[in-house]
Swiss-Prot record:
Pfam families linked to this entry: Aconitase (PF00330)
Protein name: 3-isopropylmalate dehydratase large subunit
Function as written in the Swiss-Prot or TrEMBL entry: Catalyzes the isomerization between 2-isopropylmalate and 3-isopropylmalate, via the formation of 2-isopropylmaleate.
Record's catalysed reaction(s): (2R,3S)-3-isopropylmalate = (2S)-2-isopropylmalate
Superkingdom of the organism of origin: Bacteria
Keyword annotations: 4Fe-4S, Amino-acid biosynthesis, Branched-chain amino acid biosynthesis, Iron, Iron-sulfur, Leucine biosynthesis, Lyase, Metal-binding
Any one Gene Ontology BP term: L-leucine biosynthetic process
Cofactor: [4Fe-4S] cluster
Gene: leuC
Coiled coil (UniProt feature): none
Amino acid sequence: MAQTLYDKLWQSHVVDTGDDGTTVLYIDRHLLHEVTSPQAFEGLKLAGRRPWRVSANLMVADHNVPTTDRSEGIADPTSRLQVETLDHNAHEYGLTYFSMRDKRQGIVHVIGPEQGATLPGMTVVCGDSHTSTHGAFGALAHGIGTSEVEHVLATQTLLAQKSKAMLVQVDGALPVGVTAKDIVLAIIGKIGTAGGTGYAIEFAGSTIRSLSMEGRMTICNMAIEAGARAGMVAVDETTINYVKGRPLSPVGPHWDRAVEYWRTLHSDVGAKFDLVVTLNAAEVKPQVSWGTSPEMVVSVDGRVPDPDKEKDATKRDGMEKALVYMGLKPNTPITDIRIDKVFIGSCTNSRIQDLRAAAAVVRGKHRASNVKLAMVVPGSGLVKEQAEREGLDKIFKDAGFEWREPGCSMCLAMNADRLEPGERCASTSNRNFEGRQGAGGRTHLVSPAMAAAAGIEGHFVDVRAL
């Protein structure tokens, strides 16, 4: 019987299935950070248990770490306590840990693939909603809650219900200036933030195949923003070439056997999906979100939508509230929206390819006078090192952009990087919820190139015209 990629990944990890469909699923890789793990470790300690499979766990501090000078540690007491607790638990249980001062430290969804901790065919979980990022490698990856973090630590398994399967087929040549971020925003704009609810999404088609692993990670990262449990891409040569030689990748005969298996990780011809969505990449333009949900997005040459033209009363009400919060009026051209700050970073867009794209836009130019702050936050210490070897840091600094240390930063404002009330930000992150980047802050989701262009011009512009 023809199987989808999701079917193959699921079935190869089933330990047992109950009469109600509840499945005990084996977990290959468990990623942990400082925000969702403290209670899990405390529960483990109170129960007198220890991690079942020490080598399956990889820990890193990312949400609360400062992106400025780290020589004096973390000023905020709550943030400091969370990181210190992570440090203690790592040493207490002998788990691999990249501390704040380790050059391998970075955002958990950047360092996992970077280290080869994420490999094709794996089940990958983390107490973080954007764990779907790792599905780009032909893996089954999704976020879990704190109680589930404890369960995985103790048993190396997870109780789960199988999702339905959705295929998002993207075909066509990607236009110049249009990126993976624009593709995934266009997908979410098409199906909505609830469109993927109850599904695991496989992203396929010639456009997806043409993307680098960085681009595929961006796509899968935001599968959760479409409501999906997981996002994934079939394995191909791009996947295999990326993971080869990584610190935790197999070597020698183990590599050969692994590659042989990885090449089977694709949906079979004739496999049935519960839902199929198509998108013509040639029609996609650079995207800019205008509201307080990722589905509230339009092309850069468009206008802020008019709620009066929305027939659905619930959607109309949401649009009206979003416009009030965002301080925007219907029919305003997107290119007339001025910004106060720029954030280039997050687990969506902080990899070397993202930084190169942004640097190419700002090279030889300077930040607009009305832009108070433009910050670039690499996804890991290793990304930062590579960017500096390529001279990208100098390009950004010469353009008036700040070059920071790695971490989650302004994506969710859990450290000192945040917006003030009313400030408007061109952000390469994944969520534009109310207060996401700071109380009263207004977030517009864009690609790295679009964020960089807005920082130079002081308002949104079509990067294709630069």
